[in-house]
Amino acid sequence: NYGLLLTPALLSIGQDTDDIVTLGVMYAETFIGTYATKEILKAVVDRPRPYTYFEGAPEEDIEDWNNSFPSGHTALSFASAGFISYVFSAYYPESSWRIPVTIAAYSAAAATSVLRILGGNHFMSDVLAGAAIGTLWGVGIPMLHTLGDNVKMGATPFALAFSLSF
């Protein structure tokens, strides 16, 4: 799972300094957005983890026994996979490696999801929600950056607003 967090650095190989900074900022935005969304949902949704239903589950010894929804590992893995596949395809649109890179990134993210379910840490709905959250942030942030001046974002004390023009 954490290997996927480092792989966007590979996208910066052979890029100029401005591109490296842009990639770093985009990836930081992706990571922070995914992490914040995951944390907010975990605070709002009080869902026990699957292992708490097993006999002998040590609830009192585990702090996050009720933080099943959504799967944070899955969200961050899919955010990385979405980011990698989108940015790689944008930087190398003619590359024959676009499909293999996308398959590898999403396979690693899917493997993380499966292991979270098999480990008794999450239900299927937890990982599906995490995958959706991660993919939205992972693809959404670089996509917003490519739209450039057509996207405006502003913050108020009560909300975050987006404006998209064509």
Show which residues each predicted segment covers:
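Hydrophobic alpha-helical transmembrane segments
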Residues: N1-A9
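Membrane-helix interface linkers and caps
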Residues: D16-I20
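Conserved, well-structured interaction surfaces
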Residues: A9-Q15
